[in-house]
Amino acid sequence: MAAQGFLLIATFLLVLMVLARPLGSGLARLINDIPLPGTAGVERILFRLPGVSDHEMNWKQYLCAILGLNMLGLAVLFFMLLGQHYLPLNPQQLPGLSWDLALNTAVSFVTNTNWQSYSGETTLSYFSQMAGLTVQNFLSAASGIAVIFAFIRAFTRQSMSTLGNAWVDLLRITLWVLVPVALLIALFFIQQGAQQNFLPYQAVNTVEGAQQLLPMGPVASQEAIKMLGTNGGGFFNANSSHPFENPTALTNFVQMLAIFLIPTALCFAFGEVTGDRRQGRMLLWAMSVIFVICVGVVMWAEVQGNPHLLALGADSSINMEGKESRFGVLVSSLFAVVTTAASCGAVIAMHDSFTALGGMVPMWLMQIGEVVFGGVGSGLYGMMLFVLLAVFIAGLMIGRTPEYLGKKIDVREMKLTALAILVTPTLVLMGAALAMMTDAGRSAMLNPSPHGFSEVLYAVSSAANNNGSAFAGLSANSPFWNCLLAFCMFVGRFGVIIPVMAIAGSLVSKKSQPASSGTLPTHGPLFVGLLIGTVLLVGALTFIPALALGPVAEYLS
């Protein structure tokens, strides 16, 4: 079993790096504001039609463009879900959503979280899924990538005030990266057996003689961008464990690759754009070390079996509860870590049924800010915040003004970095405390034990860090939970983007200083260790007390 697990992890990472490298080169061209071959004419036409200016923006203008697009998308999706029953492509005549569920769902998909307090096949029409959720899957992913584009430019430009043009970046990211790659993935899913139709639900007779209603719909097209954009919201309630979404072991492997593809490619692009590929490799090493350790822990915990069943004398040599038999323990464990290391949230197994330690690792990966590969764009700018913090700590230890890539890190940047890092832990801890203090919060718990607290902590961690997965024992479709989680998702997304853009605006105006003998190397194993230590230290200090009340207490009981 250990050899199989090692081979699975090694194969996954090897294929990932091979695919991400060329994509990283393409992203580097876009960051450097170089149109891809044959696209310049199309771009000019698309900008001329709506009269959009392609002039460069400062950080405030860039931020306002991103926020404005997302707020418009939020309003459109909210009213679309409310009035779903008036819109076409609704063969099952599904009614509109309640205001609180519509708000939660709209915020969820606009913020790239894709938390779902509903069952897709019994709640949403084809039009809502396709014109509402799938569109936001593209736009939310493009928004995150655009922010990291601007942030990277802050290190490569000197004594400037502009970070690029948000509309140009959004157009190029969507048309030349997300749409083509998602199209290829969708066609592959269809070839493998994923659904793509607009038929009414089909009544069939099962082998037992009973009748069953099979849901239909345009699944493959949504599934592709759901994974590529680290969105994660499933067309069906069972998400990627449903055979209509994820029909074969090969589609499952491609789905895991798609989740990590753009976050990995962005690391390669970062190294290429800064002129020092070692910087990108440093980030990949730090992410990969944490990732491999976490996968190993989850695999070990799940292979041990369920201790409660073992205590009762039942056969539980491995923990198969909540897992698809066609995928098994090792693949389910790998997928769980992939989907929570990135801000995806898609699942092929129920995380609520993992062992105490097996479920704690995905929860902790979200709590440290989704920086281990992370979401498209958001993962890298989240990790870059920890890079700045690590550089600052190192500067304090050696008595020098901290600098990174030649840019001095001053008080303003550190205050904004601390603010951005503290946003999500504050939301998680205060949100969980509020839920446990109120009857409306506690009544949603399936279990009154430490595992019940873990369900609450997982839900708020998932929402605040824009992941979207859940310990599904929590009954979250209530006004209290829909509003609480919507607030956490909204602030967790834009409360980090705003200081990140402010940091970019500050750094882009500075001159780049040449490296000297006292400059801290930020590309070697020493800095990789320092960066990993910084991530672990912040995560440990912030969440160990809360984790001790949930999964740790469950493990020891």
Swiss-Prot record:
It is a multi-pass membrane protein. Pfam families: KdpA. The chain crosses the membrane at residues 5-25, 63-83, 132-152, 170-190, 253-273, 283-303, 329-349, 356-376, 379-399, 416-436, 484-504, 526-546. It comes from the Bacteria. One of its GO terms (molecular function) is P-type potassium transmembrane transporter activity. One of its GO terms (cellular component) is plasma membrane. Keywords: Cell inner membrane, Cell membrane, Ion transport, Membrane, Potassium, Potassium transport, Transmembrane, Transmembrane helix, Transport. It is found in: Cell inner membrane. Its main location: membrane. HAMAP family: KdpA. Belongs to the KdpA family. Part of the high-affinity ATP-driven potassium transport (or Kdp) system, which catalyzes the hydrolysis of ATP coupled with the electrogenic transport of potassium into the cytoplasm. This subunit binds the periplasmic potassium ions and delivers the ions to the membrane domain of KdpB through an intramembrane tunnel. NCBIfam families: kdpA. This is Potassium-transporting ATPase potassium-binding subunit. It comes from Shigella flexneri.
